[in-house]
């Protein structure tokens, strides 16, 4: 489960930000997770709750925004929606599709007090 190490990385970023801003606690963390990122939102929620126990982020709400997958189809020469990383183009059926979006995971927002 790589979500545990990802949650630990998010916590490190959150703690660094909270420390830099002299915050007393973290109220909310917003993550953007691409549908093609191989990150399971429910697993990251579980892991985030586990790794934040005893930290400045304990009890913080975790909001996840799903980023749709997109890719460039070399046959169609256009951007197409993607639902799986190595899937076929929904327009022409070609497998020559290069992902262009939805593979990322990033911290979009941290609310502190």
Swiss-Prot record:
- Which Gene Ontology biological process is one annotated for this entry? protein maturation
- Where do the annotations place Ni(2+) binding? 2
- Which terms are listed as keywords in the entry? Metal-binding, Nickel, Zinc
Q: Its domain of life?
A: Bacteria
GO MF annotation list: nickel cation binding; zinc ion binding
PROSITE patterns annotated for this entry?
HYPA
Q: What does this protein do?
A: Involved in the maturation of [NiFe] hydrogenases. Required for nickel insertion into the metal center of the hydrogenase.
Family matches, as NCBIfam families:
hypA
Name assigned to this protein: Hydrogenase maturation factor HypA
The gene it comes from is hypA
């Amino acid at each position: 489960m790589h979500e545990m190490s990802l949650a630990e990385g998010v916590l490190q970023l959150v703690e660094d930000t909270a420390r830099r801003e002299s915050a007393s606690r973290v109220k909310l963390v917003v993550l953007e997770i691409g549908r093609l990122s191989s990150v399971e939102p429910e697993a990251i929620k579980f892991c985030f709750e586990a790794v934040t126990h005893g930290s400045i982020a304990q009890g913080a709400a975790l909001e996840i925004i799903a980023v749709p997958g997109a890719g460039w189809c070399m046959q169609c020469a256009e951007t197409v929606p993607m639902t799986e990383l190595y899937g076929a183009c929904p327009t022409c059926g070609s497998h020559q599709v290069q992902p262009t979006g939805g593979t990322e995971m990033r911290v979009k927002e941290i609310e502190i007090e």
